[in-house]
Amino acid sequence: MPLLCADIGNSHTVLGLVSGGSVLADWRVATDERNTADDWSVLLRGLLGAALEEIDGIAVCATVPAVLHEWREMLTRHFPAVRHVVVEPGVRTGVPVLMDNPREVGTDRIINALAAVHEYGGPAIVVDFGGTATTFDVVSAQGQYVGGSISPGIELSLESLGRRGAQLRKVELLRPRSVIAKNTVEALQSGMVFGVAAQVEGIVDRMIGELGVGATDVQVIATGYLAPVVLDECRCFTHHAPWLTLRGLELVFERNA
């Protein structure tokens, strides 16, 4: 029986039916802080239909406290008989967090670290391309979360340009014909696609240098729904794992349920 995994991010919520490391079905919906527990229940029943009655359990991680509160309420009221794990401090992940304040680290980042080491080994660097933020997370060869970096996400950057630039408008995230653009739309696309690619390669290169290992000794994994936008422009990635967080949620569920 599959597990329902929910990765609740600032911009979007990714839902997936996961079994044995494979994603059988998936959905991506906007994260709306106005949604109540009842709203989320209606949404889940509409998306999953009869499949919701066949799930083995529910695993949840969230970066939005208000939404997580409603999910807890939903699980208690609408799915009281379904086993569930909400990833938070105190939940066993098996990942030592070597940070000044481990509780500050987003649960999705710890889950990605767990899945990365489980699937590919360490040391590893996970680059998660979200709409609000692009995160870089470093895992040691021993499976320890040793730190990372956070930069503005691609969608957030584009929206900020649109709000602040009077003559700029929102554009589709596509690879332009060349870096040297001939119109405003392609100039914005060039800055986003090639700019983010250069940023990613630069940060990854610096991280590998600080780890003190050879570039070929590090697994560099791209994940997140915006990864395909820049994937072909980055030479640093060894793996593209679009469902890394869902796989990590499955692993955490197995350790705690």
Swiss-Prot record:
<keyword id="KW-0479">Metal-binding</keyword>
<comment type="similarity">
    <text>Belongs to the type III pantothenate kinase family.</text>
</comment>
<comment type="pathway">
    <text>Cofactor biosynthesis; coenzyme A biosynthesis; CoA from (R)-pantothenate: step 1/5.</text>
</comment>
<feature type="binding site">
    <location>
        <begin position="7"/>
        <end position="14"/>
    </location>
    <ligand>
        <name>ATP</name>
    </ligand>
</feature>
<dbReference type="InterPro" id="IPR004619">
    <property type="entry name" value="Type_III_PanK"/>
</dbReference>
<dbReference type="GO" id="GO:0046872">
    <property type="term" value="F:metal ion binding"/>
</dbReference>
<keyword id="KW-0067">ATP-binding</keyword>
<keyword id="KW-0630">Potassium</keyword>
<feature type="binding site">
    <location>
        <position position="132"/>
    </location>
    <ligand>
        <name>ATP</name>
    </ligand>
</feature>
<keyword id="KW-0808">Transferase</keyword>
<keyword id="KW-0418">Kinase</keyword>
<protein>
    <recommendedName>
        <fullName>Type III pantothenate kinase</fullName>
        <ecNumber>2.7.1.33</ecNumber>
    </recommendedName>
</protein>
<comment type="subunit">
    <text>Homodimer.</text>
</comment>
<dbReference type="GO" id="GO:0005737">
    <property type="term" value="C:cytoplasm"/>
</dbReference>
<dbReference type="GO" id="GO:0015937">
    <property type="term" value="P:coenzyme A biosynthetic process"/>
</dbReference>
<dbReference type="GO" id="GO:0005524">
    <property type="term" value="F:ATP binding"/>
</dbReference>
<feature type="binding site">
    <location>
        <position position="128"/>
    </location>
    <ligand>
        <name>K(+)</name>
    </ligand>
</feature>
<comment type="function">
    <text>Catalyzes the phosphorylation of pantothenate (Pan), the first step in CoA biosynthesis.</text>
</comment>
<dbReference type="InterPro" id="IPR043129">
    <property type="entry name" value="ATPase_NBD"/>
</dbReference>
<feature type="active site" description="Proton acceptor">
    <location>
        <position position="108"/>
    </location>
</feature>
<keyword id="KW-0547">Nucleotide-binding</keyword>
<keyword id="KW-0963">Cytoplasm</keyword>
<dbReference type="GO" id="GO:0004594">
    <property type="term" value="F:pantothenate kinase activity"/>
</dbReference>
<keyword id="KW-0173">Coenzyme A biosynthesis</keyword>
<feature type="binding site">
    <location>
        <position position="184"/>
    </location>
    <ligand>
        <name>substrate</name>
    </ligand>
</feature>
<feature type="binding site">
    <location>
        <begin position="106"/>
        <end position="109"/>
    </location>
    <ligand>
        <name>substrate</name>
    </ligand>
</feature>
<dbReference type="Pfam" id="PF03309">
    <property type="entry name" value="Pan_kinase"/>
</dbReference>
